[in-house]
Amino acid sequence: MKILLIGASGQLGRDLLTALAHHHVLGTTRGTAGLEHVKLEADWPSPIALDVCNEADLRTTIFSFVPNLVINCAAYHRVDDIERDAAQALAVNALAVHRMALLCREVDAALLYVSTDYVFDGAKGAPYVEADPPNPLSAYGASKLAGELLLRAAWPKHYIIRTCGLYGLAGASGKADDVRPRSSGNFVNTMLRLATEGRPIRVVDDQTCTPTFTRDLAAQIALLIETEAYGTYHATNDGACTWYEFAREVFRLAGLSVDVQPVSSAAYGAPARRPPYSVLENHALKALGIDRMRPWQEALAEYVAMGVVQ
């Protein structure tokens, strides 16, 4: 299968390059810096720069490569920053997705869009299934939901993958908003880095979700795309925890004694509202008989054992 992987330099993108190694993959990123260590097959095209908000660039890339599938991992996810300026989030998370869908329709390519648990408000208090009505609390969640709606309206050959709290070896900029705004690196790496500073660490304890290892999600996506069973899917590691509980498990696995202090979302005072309960049930994957997502504790243990902190 010819796959155009947009956002190949991110956490999920890099793990997808590995998981899709048996396919013909062209990776794109905002810039090619940071991809030097990614080993591609000799006959694969080198990763190229692509601005997803530039319609001409998108058209040229899609029409020259003519993929069977486009996987869009590109996203603007600085949740708190988006509350102050939602325009960029709408451009990247929604309008660019709509353009991709229209272009994919022209070349008859399927489109896979990675969405978020933040499309829900958390009021259900039980795991969300794919059919539950979304109601985002934040501008970020609204931008991702807009992307979902525009994709569904434009092109039926699509996969929408809702997931949560991604962490992986590539790290991610701006993914630790609930701990310290503008921290670089994913939540796990941020926790391990803050532990070296010797100060108490405050982590919210009233947001329950399922942090997910990108290696596991990439493997699940690789399995799903073989089915051509288009639609909306929830895909997270199994189980649930608060971010405080997750942080404590990070330190336990790392063998670190750290003063971790639980704090409420209200006391933490982040600009964007988060759902108090956004656990996703992988109902559609289970219905297909292909849910391979292991418990979050097992995934985290493997990640911490790798000893990679960025």
Language-model features: locations:
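N-terminal Rossmann NAD(P)H-binding glycine-rich loop of SDR-like oxidoreductase domains
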Residues: I3-H22
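NAD(P)H-binding glycine-rich loop region in Rossmannoid oxidoreductase-like domains
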Residues: A49-V92, L103
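Glycine-rich NAD(P)-binding loop of the Rossmann-fold in SDR/ketoreductase-type enzymes
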Residues: C53, R84, Q88-R99, P134, ...
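NAD(P)-dependent short-chain dehydrogenase/reductase
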Residues: L149-T208, D216
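Mid/C-terminal beta-alpha module of Rossmann-like enzyme folds, strongest
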Residues: V204, Q220-I221, T227-P271, P276
